[in-house]
Amino acid sequence: MHPCLVETESVSLLQEEITIITMASSTFPTVNKCTSIGREKHTVVADMDGTLLIGRSSFPYFALIAFEVGGVLRLLIYLLASPIAAILYYFISESAGIQVLVFASMAGMKLSSIESVARAVLPKFYSSDLHPETWRVFSSCGKRCVLTANPRIMVEPFLKEFLGADMVLGTEIASYKGRATGLICKPGILVGDKKAQVLKKTFGDEKPDIGLGDRVTDAPFMALCKEGYIVPAKPKVTTVTSDKLPKPIIFHDGRLVQKPTPLMALLIILWIPIGFPLACLRIAAGSLLPMKFVYCAFKALGVRVIVKGTPPPPVETSKTNHQSGVLFICSHRTLLDPIFLSTALGRAIPAVTYSVSRLSEIISPIKTVRLSRDRATDAAMIKKLLQEGDLAICPEGTTCREPFLLRFSALFAELTDELVPVAMVNRMSMFHGTTARGWKGMDPFYFFMNPSPVYEVTFLNKLPKELTCGSGKTSHEVANYIQRVVASTLSYECTSFTRRDKYRALAGNDGTVVEKTNKANKVMGC
């Protein structure tokens, strides 16, 4: 018999077997009836949308890829294609609807760019939508498999790194010369019987212990498991908190603050033509006006600056009195931290940075000095700047969006005893003003494109003399103490993570870039 006929016959027999089993198991108990005790040696197979995740739609996650890789125009194309996808999905073919979403969001994109977004951006949004009952069962099993219609390249980093999945069976997208074509590899979109076929091919005669799904089309693969449970649609279910995940999400990237639902995606597209000119106006006000007027200008333009604590008065320094300026030790949220510090003080405070883009240097209203990464050179430069007046530094070396403080570099503590900790925190409703993967020159524009961004600057008490290096404390003791004080003020958690940890997690490098000849290596800051 011809091999193709044998393969066709095998597929037909498998489909018949699946149909018979599905008819015999047309109803499954709900997931809350599944015990999670004694499952350490069991294998679980779970669907993703509507099962592991509360939301049943994958629209927001494809929208994130469209925006983060292709920009606002690609998001617009994707949004225009979504009604077609919805009609196909609900009235003609589930797989055809998903195919349209894949094509509209990924066609022509580099696979490496899609993988980068999947690793650095999507986990934050996926983790905020985790179903508590499904996670209770899924996390209790020793071997975890996810079977999903979503492209594997899109979901695998989150499932394996943050949920501890051992195996991810997803739709495979086709590519040409490293770029996604928008088409799907065989056997196609994994829905209905195709899920069951892939599961049967992967596990063979071995039956997984638990199958978890949320819709009728999941019944074929659930019927191949020893136990099957349905996850009912309950939109008001409380999501799993981050502390219950095997690995907390400390670092994440991407420009969007909120999950881009269809309505939110439309608002983003409509707002950007308004928000960008508004951002330019706000930046111009901060750059061109005297610093003592910037606070009022920001307020008039919708940027709120909240000042807490008592700012120290300016220190009169000169070559004769040898008095050092105050060194402001700031927690690092965006590259705008020193600018909002200056706004709160009403005077320009120079800042040392690990590297900012040339555009950011041009539009900055304050003096910025780059660190060289050579300890002796940087120490001499900071001492010189302190002799000229007050100075700001962010010893974390890079930004962190979550309520954590990274390790403080101890160099600053060796250079002066005039230390004032400053707790910085900001609130944005639409765009993040930081990036690890994109061009940092756009960071201030994205921050000021938010409709009403907020910056809160809290001045803490000046460090007592007995807690400085001048009184016998080591620089590491001083740095760790200031980190704890700032973290306590913000209700943040101290960590020992560094800039290198962040960039390895988000960008796949250690955060350093090679500068042009005759220039020292600079660190990608912020």
Swiss-Prot record:
The keyword Membrane applies. Its main location: membrane. It is found in: Membrane. GO terms for biological process: arbuscular mycorrhizal association; cutin biosynthetic process; glycerolipid metabolic process; response to symbiotic fungus. GO terms for cellular component: membrane. Disruption phenotype: No visible phenotype under normal growth conditions. Unable to be colonized by arbuscular mycorrhizal fungi, with a defect in hyphopodia formation on the surface of the root. Defects in colonization by an oomycete pathogen, with the absence of appressoria formation. Pathway: Lipid metabolism; glycerolipid metabolism. The chain crosses the membrane at residues 72-92, 98-118, 261-281, 283-303. It is a multi-pass membrane protein. Its EC number is 2.3.1.15. A motif (HXXXXD motif) lies at residues 332-337. Pfam families: Acyltransferase, HAD_RAM2_N. It catalyses: sn-glycerol 3-phosphate + an acyl-CoA = a 1-acyl-sn-glycero-3-phosphate + CoA. Belongs to the GPAT/DAPAT family. Involved in the production of cutin monomers. Esterifies acyl-group from acyl-ACP to the sn-2 position of glycerol-3-phosphate, a step in cutin biosynthesis. Required for colonization of the root by mycorrhizal fungi, and appropriate hyphopodia and arbuscule formation. Cutin monomers act as plant signals that promote colonization by arbuscular mycorrhizal fungi. This signaling function has been recruited by pathogenic oomycetes to facilitate appressoria formation and their own invasion. This is Glycerol-3-phosphate acyltransferase RAM2. It comes from Medicago truncatula. The gene is RAM2.
